[in-house]
UniProtKB/Swiss-Prot annotation:
Coiled coil: none annotated. Component of the serine palmitoyltransferase (SPT) that catalyzes the first committed step in sphingolipid biosynthesis, which is the condensation of an acyl-CoA species and L-serine. The catalytic core is composed of a heterodimer of sptl-1 and sptl-2 or sptl-1 and sptl-3. Required for the specification of abicobasal polarity and development of the gut lumen. This is Serine palmitoyltransferase 1. It catalyses: L-serine + hexadecanoyl-CoA + H(+) = 3-oxosphinganine + CO2 + CoA. The gene is sptl-1.
Amino acid sequence: MGFLPDSWHFYIETLLVALLAYVVMRNRSKRQQEKLSKKLTERQKDELIADWTPEPLVPETPQDHPVLNPKYADGKMTKDVSIDGEKYLNMASTNFLSFIGVKRIEDRAKQTIFKYGVGSCGPRGFYGTVDVHLDLEKELAKFMGCEEAVLYSYGFATVSSAIPAYAKKGDVIFVDEGVNFAIQKGLQASRSRVEYFKHNDMEHLERLLLEQEQRDKKDPKKAKSVRRFIVVEGLYVNYADLCPLPKIIEFKWRFKVRVFIDESWSFGVIGKTGRGVTEHFNVPMEDVDMVMASLENALASTGGFCVGRSYVVGHQRLSGLGYCFSASLPPLLATAASEAISIIDEEPSRVQKVTEMAINGQKKLQDALSGSKFSLQGCPESPMKHIYYNGEDEEKQLDTFVETVFTKNHLLLTRARYLDKDELFKIRPSIRVMFQHDLTEEEIQRAVDAIRVVAHKF
């Protein structure tokens, strides 16, 4: 029993140490409370307030930021625009087919206003459907060679609504890293698993599809409920190049995936008659599950549409959020788009002229930038080109370039700007150069000469 005294001795020492720690902490806490309880004098309060420097609610905006130095254009955004009373050559807008200002389209829009007013008064499913909406859907379906089309009132909402209308949680979507912001928002809303492949890298896409194939073999029961999609752009707005559609269609049949194409930038300008990348690559429309496009670029109207098989498109009338809950497209803009489609059908040479202009313009721009710190990117057929600066402080140098040709040469270009914090992948800063139907050879040469002179000053 000799072990008992030692045991009790240990317990007593532990208790004393704990008691000592409690007393020390209690006294410290008491002193802090007494210190805090002392009232500050008015003078002390004023001194504390004077010493306090609050953090800004938003970061400071640099004085040279474009938002603080806006340029106001008067009148229509045709090839010639008036800014602060002076005339400028416009190579910054997406009016590729020069439909803005066409009297035939304007007259049709005016007639529509006299008949329907300026709005449609509700979403498509709630008294917002007018006969001109149905007419335009039929015309779009016929133009694209599809069974049915569905019309949206806003181009951005078309793409961001169409994707989550089909892809859900548990599905997998294979997406090019270079897709535009509208597609990114649609992917986010779908809650699907997204697998990104390098821009136009078909070997990388094939590896991802093979990996998914192996997952499906390991769990065939789960594989039956997983839907697979490939989402690409016809003409990538961030790169001005085309998707390799034939290879994508090959993967579609090989790996049993559905293919969605955003033709917002290729519709009306790519292909012999402006029907997009399917026409350009001679791919049957039946091989593509759905085509999405905006009416706000080549057709110079507003809104967007999706085309495909009837059972695919019809599903959006109940599941497309932008279709169900947004006010429908104003009738005057629907008839304006209809008239623009009629002109493309009647004058396919309009599309072909823009294509030739883009091809020749690319050669001239490449020659103009040769030997400078600037380079050009874009496929020859694209009426949109990107100019990059190969050096430090890209954004500042590109802004200086745009401002210089604006002030000295009366040439209107635009910097491609992005929401850097929201973009999934960093996009290289660039200047966009747009070609449109009404530009003459002399005007294009004048713009190229101005770009050449400014580019070689850096």
